[in-house]
Regions:
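A post-motif C-terminal structural segment
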Residues: 1-140
């Protein structure tokens, strides 16, 4: 259904419950919601891997609760057999100023490396899909 449009499509999937669980300082609730969000990401990547015209971006608009995976929790360096011990710390359930990651896969993904101001993501997306300097009020 999505592939029928001649100009392509845009999908935004939000893992809002991750944020809500952070407000509640519920680590296990966050973990469950992160697993569900990971399933959505895996579906998007499976679609993108069969195409040359699909960019997948994953980021957050903020961090909530101060969830930390503390130093020295990774017990094995073998990445294909990595085990994690969850030594976690939770803050006070508010939004924080912590930097959040951005992950990109597909054409234009090189525009999403390093540390970005979140307002620059819009312009990097424009460049990735070849839309630059739209006149005011123009819809694509």
């Amino acid at each position: 259904m999505l592939e029928q449009g001649c100009k392509g499509f845009f999908i935004m999937a939000e893992g809002s419950q991750i944020d809500w669980e952070g407000h509640d300082n519920d680590f296990y609730g966050q973990y469950d919601e992160i697993e569900e969000f990971e399933n959505a990401i895996e579906s998007a990547l499976a679609f993108a891997k069969n195409r040359q015209d699909t960019l997948v971006l994953v980021t957050a608009d903020h961090e909530t609760g101060g969830l930390l995976i503390e130093k020295d929790t990774l017990r094995y360096k073998e990445t294909n057999q990595m085990k994690v011990s969850w030594n976690t710390a939770i803050g006070k359930g508010d939004h924080t100023g912590a930097m959040v990651p951005i992950f990109a896969y597909g054409p234009g993904s090189a525009n999403f490396t390093g540390i970005l101001d979140n307002t620059d993501i819009f312009f990097a997306m424009q460049e990735a899909i070849g839309i630059n300097d739209l006149p005011d009020g123009t819809c694509y």
